[in-house]
Each structure stands twice: as C-alpha cells, then as structure tokens.
C-alpha cells in the first residue's frame, strides 16, 4: 500500500548558477558526505546535483512535508547496478517509521535541462 508519494523537478541551470555562486557551501548544504564522495568525480556536477536535489524534495513531499526533515536526512546513493537508492536518516527515518514505510522507490531522470524525481513510500 502506498503511504506517501512525492514528485519534484529541478532546473539544471539554476543548480549550476548556485554552484558557481556559492561553490562548495551549496554542495555541502545539500549533500551528505557519502553523496559528495559519490558525485565528486562526475563530469557534470550540476546535472548530478539537480537529480539529487529533486529526489530529496520528492522524498520530503512523500513524507508529508515535515518541517524537521533536512537535506542531510535524505541520502541518495547508487546501488550495485548504478540505479539510485534512497535512504532516510534522522527525523526523516522517524517519520517513515511512524507511517509504516517498508520500502522506498525512487526514480530520477534528466532531459532538456531539467531533472525530475519521483519517490514512492510503500507501507504494509
């Protein structure tokens, strides 16, 4: 049973401008240390970050827009096949447990300068 659904889009150009303007501060504010390590070698950091940004926003929406869910409470890492895997940490994990979340599905796509993400929280 679906207990939460979120979708978000992010402009790759807006992320690129923020990276240029704020540098590593922007990168570090949005990404966990694990995510920073995963994306540091990507040739297009803005494209990669836009996808993660959209996925984190989609996860927050799937959780019901809780005000105490922060960027670092949602971590997106590649699985063994390279597909995105979303893990909830901190207050996001606590909210998911209260909702009865058993499985998290995430999809990230990029096209025409936009990154889009969908997150489904599956419960009992």
Residue ranges and their predicted role:
Residues 1-124:
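Core catalytic alpha/beta fold that binds nucleotide/phospho-ligands
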């Amino acid at each position: 049973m679906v207990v939460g659904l979120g979708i978000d889009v992010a402009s790759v150009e807006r992320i690129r401008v923020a990276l240029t303007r704020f540098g590593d501060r922007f990168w570090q504010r949005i990404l966990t240390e694990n995510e920073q390590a995963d994306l540091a070698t990507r040739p297009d950091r803005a494209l990669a970050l836009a996808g993660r940004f959209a996925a984190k926003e989609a996860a927050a929406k799937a959780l019901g827009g809780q005000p105490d869910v922060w960027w670092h409470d949602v971590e997106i890492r590649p699985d063994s096949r390279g597909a995105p895997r979303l893990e909830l940490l901190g207050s996001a994990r606590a909210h998911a447990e209260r909702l009865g979340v058993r499985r998290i599905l995430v999809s990230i796509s990029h096209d025409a300068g936009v990154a889009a993400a969908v997150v489904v929280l599956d419960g009992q």
